[in-house]
Curated annotation (Swiss-Prot):
Record gene name: MAPT
Organism whose genome encodes this protein: Capra hircus
Protein known as: Microtubule-associated protein tau
Composition bias, Basic and acidic residues: 1-32, 90-106
A Pfam family the protein falls into: Tubulin-binding
Sites of Phosphotyrosine modification: 19, 159, 356
GO BP term, example: microtubule cytoskeleton organization
Length: 403
């Protein structure tokens, strides 16, 4: 069964060592309302019932805590803060009965908190710190007063675990084992009051303003007041405006020698006289032909036809040979055909006579003898000298051919 969430505020008074537990909701189970706040005795001894309540938690509380907690990590983190909250110093003086007020009485700084789950009723404030001890925490023996004092001034539980509702931050007698740094439960905002310790009061007394310094005997820096009453003399300078006396001024050397000189250029007069052209004569011979008229305009160009037949004569001797016919045209070019058979002769003289009939048609149709072959086989070339040369050429060519 889920429990209603409870929020607690833990306020520490460093001057007196008291802790105040405040229940914001006031909803608790009936079985957990009676959890008295036990304080150590004057002689440093404790009541037997308080030791057992501090060392252990009820089985029902542990069982319910194991079933109600959200996550194991959040419970482990809350367990570390609970064990640290149980540390209480034993060297303080004075003990008293259970206190139902918001703060403990003066002279009872060492209060020990019981650890059943739940909180005090709404009417009881500061009666007990209702905390849940996880199953992992084990009770440890009490420590010396010095260690308790250091534990009280050391850690402070400023938040409650969201996984374990109704578990406020409180102090324990024994130091808790170091928890892993990765386990960070969700923090709940807790209002904390500033520590009220004698040291803070002393610091306030020391911060009080001291007596004001005497500023009448303060001396100035070296040489800073020597010219304190000095006034600048620039304002006493007077600028006097005097008129210049130009009566005795003399000119520069030679500047007044020609002061009355008048430039003579202005006396020149430009006289305009008309030119008399009546006596002007012309240039040499310019008036001799003044009435001359050019005769070019009187020349007439006549067009006459030329009669070449009547008047034209031939060049010298050009008509003497007008009927001459050149004689080159009467020459004839003869063509002779070479025949090897007709002009050939046998290598051996067999005594036969070669007769050749020319193809040219002529009046003499009788055959003629080209050559007279002697008994010795020689040819008579007296009749035709051209044929003799041809015969020699033919014979030479035949000899080469092997005929």
């Amino acid at each position: 069964m889920a429990e209603p969430r409870q929020e607690f505020d833990v306020m520490e008074d460093h001057a007196q060592g008291d802790y105040t537990l405040q229940d914001h909701e006031g909803d608790m189970e009936p079985g957990l309302k009676e959890s008295p706040l036990q304080t150590p005795a004057d002689d440093g001894s404790e009541e037997p019932g308080s030791e057992t309540s501090d060392a252990k938690s009820t089985p029902t509380a542990e069982a319910e805590e194991a079933g109600i907690g959200d996550t194991s990590n959040l419970e482990d983190q809350a367990a570390g803060h609970v064990t640290q909250a149980r540390m209480v110093s034993k060297g303080k003086d004075g003990t008293g009965p259970d206190d139902k007020k918001a703060k403990g009485a003066d002279g009872k700084p060492g209060t020990k908190i019981a650890t059943p789950r739940g909180a005090a009723p709404p009417g009881q404030k500061g009666q007990a710190n209702a905390t849940r001890i996880p199953a992992k925490t084990t009770p440890t023996p009490k420590t010396s007063p010095g260690t308790g004092e250091s534990g009280k001034s050391g850690d402070r539980s400023g938040y409650s675990s969201p996984g374990s509702p109704g578990t406020p931050g409180s102090r324990s007698r024994t130091p808790s084992l170091p928890t892993p740094p990765t386990r960070e439960p969700k923090k709940v905002a807790v209002v904390r009051t500033p520590p009220k310790s004698p040291s803070a009061a002393k610091s306030r007394l020391q911060a009080a303003p001291g007596p004001m310094p005497d500023l009448k005997n303060v001396k100035s820096k070296i040489g800073s007041t020597e010219n304190l009453k000095h006034q600048p003399g620039g304002g006493k300078v007077q600028i006097i405006n005097k008129k210049l006396d130009l009566s005795n001024v003399q000119s520069k050397c030679g500047s007044k020698d020609n002061i009355k000189h008048v430039p003579g250029g202005g006396s020149v007069q430009i006289v305009y006289k008309p030119v008399d052209l009546s006596k002007v004569t012309s240039k040499c011979g310019s008036l001799g032909n003044i009435h001359h008229k050019p005769g070019g305009g009187q020349v007439e160009v006549k067009s006459e036809k030329l009669d070449f037949k009547d008047r034209v004569q031939s060049k010298i001797g050009s008509l003497d040979n007008i009927t001459h016919v050149p004689g080159g045209g009467n020459k004839k070019i003869e063509t002779h055909k070479l025949t090897f058979r007709e002009n050939a002769k046998a290598k051996t003289d067999h005594g036969a006579e070669i007769v050749y009939k020319s193809p040219v048609v002529s009046g003499d149709t009788s055959p003629r003898h080209l050559s007279n072959v002697s008994s010795t086989g020689s040819i008579d070339m007296v009749d035709s000298p051209q044929l003799a040369t041809l015969a020699d050429e033919v014979s030479a060519s035949l000899a080469k051919q092997g005929l």
